[in-house]
A protein has these predicted regions:
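Internal catalytic domains of large membrane-associated glycosyltransferases
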Residues: 1-229
Length: 229
């Protein structure tokens, strides 16, 4: 199977949104992607180069996947960060244990969140980012840092960029959240799967370059957070 593939979801009518969009937005995309890779669901995508390649080459089959790394469009992996995330998830002390009655992870971690910095070029792009984005780029002496949630509760806060165990994610979250009920799904997923903070692994992220775009993003985040309280 080739290393790079492209998938594009079908849009369906959503009565509450009064528009055509991908089922359950990003949360639905992850669920459908997971179920497809695990063989639990037929192709839910409008464009799927994996399916096309398998159909062309009879000797090619869909391999088994253990971990998925999720990134936003403006998030960059840096040298060895993917390998370090995989190593952290594969550590025996981090192996997720699912409670059969509650169907949530009670030991180990089903998902891990790295530390996220700001791209160097973005941090100096405008006067706004120079003031609010902080020091961008990579610290040459990067190491583990303290985090109040991880230190006190042995769990971090998942913000949508990280790595998760594919089978555990599917088992715990496949039918856990009703449709059209949440806007911000990252916090919920982290709570169900038990999120661990890998503060010694760093990803580089973008940053809004203008006040208007910053406030639009902040408003969306606040709406999502209030909705799940």
């Amino acid at each position: 199977l080739s290393r790079f593939h492209f998938m594009y979801r079908k849009r369906i009518w959503n009565e509450k949104e009064n528009s055509y969009l991908g089922w359950e937005r990003k949360r639905g995309m992850l669920n459908q992607f997971n179920e497809y890779l695990l063989g639990h669901e037929l192709n839910p995508f409008r464009e799927n180069t994996i399916k096309e390649e398998i159909q062309k080459e009879e000797t090619i089959t869909l391999p088994k996947f253990k971990y998925i790394i999720t990134l936003d469009a403006d998030t960059d992996l840096i040298l060895n960060s993917a390998l370090e995330l995989i190593g952290a998830m594969a550590h025996i002390l981090n192996t997720p244990v699912v409670d059969p009655k509650k169907n949530v992870v009670v030991e180990g971690y089903g998902i891990m969140q790295p530390r996220v910095g700001v791209n160097l070029d973005i941090s100096y792009q405008t006067l706004f980012t120079q003031i609010f984005a902080g020091a961008g780029g990579i610290d040459s002496y990067t190491n583990a840092i303290s985090d109040i949630y991880q230190d006190n509760f042995q769990e971090g806060i998942f913000t949508g960029k990280g790595i998760y165990n594919l089978e555990v994610f599917s088992k715990v979250l496949r039918n856990a959240i009703p449709e059209n009920t949440v806007l911000s799904h990252d916090l919920l997923e982290g709570n169900y799967l038990r999120c661990g903070l890998a503060s010694d692994v760093v990803l580089m992220d973008g940053y809004p370059t203008k006040y208007n775009s910053f406030m639009t993003r902040l408003t969306r985040w606040i709406r999502g957070d209030w909705q799940i309280i």
